[in-house]
Curated annotation (Swiss-Prot):
The keyword Cell inner membrane applies. Its main location: membrane. The chain crosses the membrane at residues 12-32, 40-60, 70-90, 97-117, 136-156. This is Lipoprotein signal peptidase.
């Protein structure tokens, strides 16, 4: 069992656990110290603003009648199971992708927990410029964003290597087939 954790992407589950714990700790701190819709200015462009999000990212489908709670929960659970399976399958040599998926998993589980326990996601990080406010978000959303950014970086970083490898394999295959034809 320990070998499974040492030799696969499961070795990065501590990142998921840390993201989940930080997310829940921050949300409970907000619940205990702020009232709903209260806003506390931290910097000239950043507030803590306690809100409930019944939808998905950017409050998508927030007023859809309640079915979205279970829909987004189901999606997050399925994605989490797929990520766990993928982490188990990933070899020790891979680093960036398992780390990215570990961040996404921790964030997904943080928001799933909110939906199951509260019926909504607790958001409180509020960035703004003048009167334009970016939609409020939380630590779980940040973990998902970090994971997605790492996936994109890996795609550009390792996509070139894979293209080169595929090109080399293709050339080798062409050379072998032309030798066979002669």
């Amino acid at each position: 069992m320990l070998k499974l954790f040492r030799e696969t992407g499961l070795r990065f589950l501590w990142i998921s656990a840390l993201a989940f714990i930080l997310d829940q700790w921050s949300k409970y701190t907000v619940i205990d110290t702020m009232s709903l819709y209260q806003s506390i200015q931290v910097l000239p462009f950043f507030n803590f603003t306690y809100v409930h999000n019944y939808g998905a990212a950017f409050s998508f489908l927030e007023n859809a009648g309640g079915w979205q709670r279970w829909f987004f929960t189901a999606i997050a659970v399925v994605v989490s199971v797929v990520i766990l399976w993928w982490l188990k399958q990933s070899p020790r040599s891979q680093k960036m992708l398992p780390v990215a998926f570990a961040f996404i998993l921790g964030g997904a589980l943080g928001n799933v927990y909110d939906r199951l326990v509260h019926g909504y996601v607790i958001d409180f990080l509020d960035f703004y410029v003048n009167n334009y406010h970016w939609p409020a978000f939380n630590i779980a959303d940040s973990a998902i964003f970090i994971g997605a950014a790492l996936l994109i970086i890996d795609m550009f970083k390792n996509g070139d290597k894979k293209s080169e490898e595929n090109g080399a394999e293709s050339k080798a295959g062409s050379a072998n087939s032309s030798e066979t034809i002669k």
